Amino acid sequence: MILSDADILDRLAEGDLVVEPLDDVDQQVQPASVDLRLGERFLEFQRTNIPCIHPTEADEVGDYVTETRVPEGEEFILHPGDFVLGTTTERVEIPPDLLATVQGRSSLGRLAIVIHATAGIVDPGYKGQITLELSNLGTAPVALTPGMRVSQLIFTELKSPAKRPYGVERGSKYQDQDGPQASRIGSDPEFHSDENQAAEHES
């Protein structure tokens, strides 16, 4: 079941669902979603001539991105073909019985701005800001202003609460994130199978 505006307001009032700061409830709470605003921090991917990026090598990923801060009221220009990581202004806390989905606002979609590439799911138990995968599929640069509403968060009630919500187990590598976070795929267990086997052998 997808939560309506009345359901969302009830859960926010109960305190187990958190979206903060929610500065303008009338404007941000939509019929079945909450509008989230663009934060001030961006991770830009550098032009590079190296043969490839190895996602499992944290140093390579870190060298590939630089952080830019754009104060509210100023503009971040997203050029055609560019891809950057942004963040929401709001910090969220998703209770174990809800799943959240991030969608871009249609008004930006009509300007060829994509808000997320693949990461549309916010797991039960997640706490933190949400990283946005911003790209410009159009032919003209588009000015994005921190503080503008860029995405919608939709909440679906689960049939039963998650037994292992995000943050409970190892591997919750983006829990409590502050600002945009580059890929941490290198910490996934499948890339450390030899280490895991060695640890099991020693024990």
From Swiss-Prot:
Its EC number is 3.5.4.13. It comes from the Archaea. The active site is at E133 (proton donor/acceptor). InterPro entries: dCTP_deaminase, dUTPase-like_sf, dUTPase_trimeric. Keywords: Hydrolase, Nucleotide metabolism, Nucleotide-binding. Pfam families: DCD. Belongs to the dCTP deaminase family. This is dCTP deaminase.
